UniProtKB/Swiss-Prot annotation:
InterPro entries: Helicase_ATP-bd, Helicase_C-like, P-loop_NTPase, SecA, SecA2, SecA_CS, SecA_DEAD, SecA_motor_DEAD. GO terms for cellular component: cell envelope Sec protein transport complex; cytosol; plasma membrane. This is Protein translocase subunit SecA 2. GO terms for biological process: intracellular protein transmembrane transport; protein import; protein targeting; protein transport by the Sec complex. SMART domains: SecA_DEAD (SM00957), SecA_PP_bind (SM00958). Pfam families: P-loop_SecA, SecA_DEAD, SecA_PP_bind, SecA_SW. NCBIfam families: PRK09200.1, secA2. It is found in: Cell membrane; Cytoplasm. The gene is secA2.
Amino acid sequence: MLTDRLRLKKARKLLNKINKLGPKMQAMSDEKLQGQTAIFKKQLKEGKSLDDILPEAYATVREADKRILGMFPYDVQVLGAIVLHNGSIAEMKTGEGKTLVATMALYLNALEGKGAMLVTPNGYLASRDKKELAPVYEWLGLSVSLAFAEEKDSKKKITAKTKRKWYNSDIVYTTASSLAFDYLFNNLASSKENQYLRPFNYVIVDEVDEVLLDEAQTPFVVSSSPNVQSNLYHLADQFVRLLDPEVDYVFKKDDQLFWLTAHGIEKAEQFFKLDSLFSNESRSVYRHIILAMGAHLTMRRGHDYLVVKGEVVLLDEDSGRLKRGVQVSTGIHQAVEAKEKVELTKIQKTAASITFPALFALFNKVSGMSGTAKVNEEEFLQTYNLKVVTIPTRVPVIRKDYRPLIFLTTIDKLMTAVDDVVEMHKTGRPVLLVAGSVENSEIISELLLNIGIPHNVLNAYNAAYEAQIIKNAGQKNAVTIATNMAGRGTDIKLGPGVKELGGLAVIGTEMLPKRVELQLAGRAGRQGDPGSSQFLISLEDSFISSNNTPRQKKYYRKLMKKKSKGKDITLLSGPRIRFSLLMLRTRKEDLNELMRSQTNKMEIILSLQRKNFYTRRDKIMKTDDLQEDVDRIIDNALNLYLEKQDLSNKSDLKYFINQHVTYQQVNVPDNLKTKKAIKDFLKELAYKILDEKKHVLINKKQANDFYQQVIISSMDGNWIDQVDRIEKIKINAQQWGRSGRPQDLLHQEKAFEAYKDFLDKITLSTFDNLLLSKIFTNEKGQLVVVFN
């Protein structure tokens, strides 16, 4: 906190300057205030920095916000905007007006003409903020866009020209996932006319902890042609349904471990008609059995995934939201689809992928906003070099946060939660009851329906109505059951008479990560309103049972034994159990941080390769004369081929020519005995074939287009295999780590070897495609290249 005070001390000096400029801005006419933008741009061209013009620019936007929106940013909001400009994270509590804070930082950083973005976790927030704030930016002379198609336009084809217009706006609002996919597709474009992104400059990441921490390990993937799909998924699913849990397999629920018993193995061999389940020939069958068992035993519908319109969609463990477009890796997803009897999605090869940490590392300056970033301050600093600065609230927080109640069983916990809702509902006090999963939200809903308590349910099934449900959650008599997704987004404003009843009551019914708990508690008590939070947890909560130590499991079994003998054990208390659960949560959060750190280290390697590849690819697309590149490729390819093969035998050389140079018969001289002589002969032959192709080409530009198509096609085809290879290296890194050497070092070595091999493959396939491809022009006069 001392560091925060020092950082804010500097910011307060700037705030004083901004406040002193207030009367000057207030006295300006609309026309004069609007003219400030042109003045600032001129000052920047003359050598002033953004820091130099910050006080006057912020004072300008502040006054514009008042005139256009009727809202004048408070001092604490200006402090938040200063922190954002400095490339740090502003931690601001729920209801403190982060949306308005962004106007100042975005305006200032857009003045250089390089672009400024605000990226949100979901489309609703981006669309809402752009619609609300665009009038301010446009009034001040800046262009603003929403860089994705809204739901009503989602089926329309978006052209590169449209996207170019979006991303060339001074200020861009978009979602993190839209930006990730646009970046990947932009770098897979077949020509510069199909590209639309300019270099990334400045970004504010809204809900930065959700994007850079919770979603850090989820890669965004563009797929290419699918791998061959196995037909064993349905058969393995049928087999697993026949298994008897008493004799055919062992399932350790707490550890999520399972295996077939000797009886189960014998049953598998009979079912699949195998001599041995563990022979090399049966390896695929065994793998599919394990996948099917995992789908049935460890993947729970309503907890880990939902089936929406015939599609298996994963659920985010922390936010409770649907993770559309994301699959569990290595066949588990298809096994779940077989279990749910929906159409199997094809396992596809990855054409391109990127994670959020790698994406935002491409910006010159990154800042962020969140209500709960301080919990992970050290991780933000170490991983992203982002400082977290807590902005003081405008008025003190008076919410009452009660100590968690610990129950032995889930049923005791849920019945207490329902009783609490009933008591509060009698007074008319609104309640937000948070369930840990979709499954639990529906159980609680049924309990409330049975006793006649009207309520709304917010979970991944009806996320489309989130804004409306949350908007009404603070009204008198409102009871809202929600998953963790209620922790972010739209503010819950109190209705008439609710303050007098004690404000919104938040009741959590699961043990959650500390940051998620703070998010949910923060839904109550916004802007000095009264409110309360109370978390009810049980030793049967999935967060606890899946992370318990053997000692804690023994303690739980001991208590359950006593309860089964008639002893009344409902509430658990005392410092020992509280400390034990606190340590359990700390261990789990430390493990999550370690996993994110390892993923980020490995992703850095792919990021470097991706950046190098896209730079090379971009250069090829933007080069008007590729003859030198083609000359170099031919020379390097022949060197590589001659290093790998001995072509001194005439028949071997002829075979090589038919495979890599031309399908036509070629007279090969008898005197080619040295590598140099063979290389010179092959090089001369290669240029002769290229010259023959040029007769089909009308001019130098068309010849360059041919070179471009061949090189880009070779690069893209090999890049797909390279990404696939790096992913396999990443998966195997943990196993290699058992050798005693650091995982990240082993991963780095293997990835470097793979990249060197990848560059060689591009050279060789480009050589082959230059010479063996067929070219012609279609009826529109366009060049068509056919690769064999």
